[in-house]
Amino acid sequence: MASGALGVGERINGVNLGNWLVLERWMKPGIFAASGEADEIWLHRATKSAELEALLTRHRDTYITEADFRNIAAHGCNLVRIPVPYFVFGDVPGHPGCTEYLDRAFDSAERAGLKILIDLHTVPGSQNGFDNGGLTGVVRWHHSPRAVAYALNVLACLARRYRDHAALFGIEAVSYTHLRAH
């Protein structure tokens, strides 16, 4: 893909980089094996801080690399969707952030001629009750003005941080919502 924005009418050929910054048990069950937990939030709660930091660092350093961005572009893609958790900035105790990986992704994508669609994949209290929402069996986010405000703030911070980066395509507000009473 040529550098610059995707144009009106230009076909988007993209891939999702799931399970990198938001863990999804069905994609890589081994990362959950020691704890037996069903989702990322409970994995974080069940794992000691130093162990969790080491586990996430090992996973994030190796699961998606600069070579993957080059390979994706070489296969004709022009966009990657990157799911991020609501604790992306590392400001939620017990949940290590991942902006350094997202920063690297933006630089790798730009070098490879790719655009990025950031996807806020989890929100406090979960938006769908599935592992991809971070918290299995719970859908409370939309009942909490505080949680909604927090998610909106994360989106605003992501927009401020990446708005001028040449690789930014857009930001997906909240992924896979299922707003039902719980």
Segments predicted by a language model, with ranges:
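N-terminal carbohydrate-binding accessory modules
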Residues: 1-77
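Catalytic metal-binding/acid-base residues of hydrolase active sites
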Residues: 21, 121, 174
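Aromatic-lined carbohydrate-binding surfaces of glycoside hydrolases
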Residues: 84-91, 116-135
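Hydrophobic faces of well-ordered beta-strands that scaffold small-molecule active sites
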Residues: 13-15, 80-82, 116-118, 171
